[in-house]
Amino acid sequence: MADYQGKNVVIIGLGLTGLSCVDFFLARGVTPRVMDTRMTPPGLDKLPEAVERHTGSLNDEWLMAADLIVASPGIALAHPSLSAAADAGIEIVGDIELFCREAQAPIVAITGSNGKSTVTTLVGEMAKAAGVNVGVGGNIGLPALMLLDDECELYVLELSSFQLETTSSLQAVAATILNVTEDHMDRYPFGLQQYRAAKLRIYENAKVCVVNADDALTMPIRGADERCVSFGVNMGDYHLNHQQGETWLRVKGEKVLNVKEMKLSGQHNYTNALAALALADAAGLPRASSLKALTTFTGLPHRFEVVLEHNGVRWINDSKATNVGSTEAALNGLHVDGTLHLLLGGDGKSADFSPLARYLNGDNVRLYCFGRDGVQLAALRPEVAEQTETMEQAMRLLAPRVQPGDMVLLSPACASLDQFKNFEQRGNEFARLAKELG
């Protein structure tokens, strides 16, 4: 447990996470100062009066006078104000670092470009099925500091690359990088390896590293070692097995579950299940209750979620596909009897869209591209692409064309912030329009 008495603490970024940091320090007798580049950040009205605040910009004077800066994952460490503070020897951490210094129970830590919320939630469900008092949060749901509790027997944290950059005290009982594909390239000017390096921090001091046998970028820099357990489609300690038209989850050659008993579908979800099982095993959860959780878990909203099945047409909301890798996961092995009407678009965060091209061949694909990067996406296969300003226009365009056996899939490969508040709002809008138009 760290001692912050007498420290001059500055918190950058409000919102739920910033408020959890404020509460953390106030409970320890330290009154921090808070700043946010937004004029009226969320949570400003909930800030106790005693806490000094500065909004609309960063206050360099406060930063340079600090003993400790707690930075929101939303601000890049490369920001000139933070660079100057780091050069002056001022410690910069994030809320996850504060959490790791205090947590008394084992931590399962999960990162990756895609699938991390599903796997985090699944491991949490596995713990609950075993009767374990578990705290689930981090980059999903509740901020980590709100989970700190003497009664907690296990923590399961989803961590973003941004959170890992400011974390050095994590000692996970089990840690995984599910996959590494281009995302947030606007924050990583040196490209994919810089982004990967941030993710790799999760393995430091981990007891077990769960790696993806199909993705070399998830391996520790020095290669797999005795701490590593692997999962994969056809290879790995935890893998899929296809026999007589059925698919099984297997562990070291032993069949443990037929996927038809799972509520989740799609190959990417079966590998998510394998990763969750590997983490749960490493954390010492009983296998039987973990498998039971796999048969009852229905998945998360906005993640390949069937929002309407009507007149033989399936409308699927995969709004959480905010990067290319996530849309690839949705399209890989996807079977559609009729035509796939694919909605793509939004803010591509400087990503390369070309890996999607191989999934867009064939006569039964139609593209509807919208938002900031709609033009670029339509260029993937112009002869079957239509371009509109908004998602709603695209949906009104495609609705009269759908036939029984078709699928309408929103898997945009882009962030939503050019036209929506977040991916949830985009997904809810899709669901609303699907019910109106379908």
Curated annotation (Swiss-Prot):
GO molecular function, one term: ATP binding
GO biological process: cell division; cell wall organization; peptidoglycan biosynthetic process; regulation of cell shape
Pathway: Cell wall biogenesis; peptidoglycan biosynthesis
Record-listed ATP binding positions: 112-118
Main location, first listed in the record: cytoplasm
EC number: 6.3.2.9
Coiled-coil annotated spans: none
Location(s) in or outside the cell: Cytoplasm
Superkingdom in the source lineage: Bacteria
UniProt catalytic activity: UDP-N-acetyl-alpha-D-muramoyl-L-alanine + D-glutamate + ATP = UDP-N-acetyl-alpha-D-muramoyl-L-alanyl-D-glutamate + ADP + phosphate + H(+)
Keyword Ligase (UniProt): yes
GO cellular component labels: cytoplasm
Entries under Pfam families matching the protein: Mur_ligase_C (PF02875), Mur_ligase_M (PF08245), MurD-like_N (PF21799)
Keyword field: ATP-binding, Cell cycle, Cell division, Cell shape, Cell wall biogenesis/degradation, Cytoplasm, Ligase, Nucleotide-binding, Peptidoglycan synthesis
Protein family: Belongs to the MurCDEF family.
Stated role: Cell wall formation. Catalyzes the addition of glutamate to the nucleotide precursor UDP-N-acetylmuramoyl-L-alanine (UMA).
Name used for this protein in its record: UDP-N-acetylmuramoylalanine--D-glutamate ligase
Gene: murD
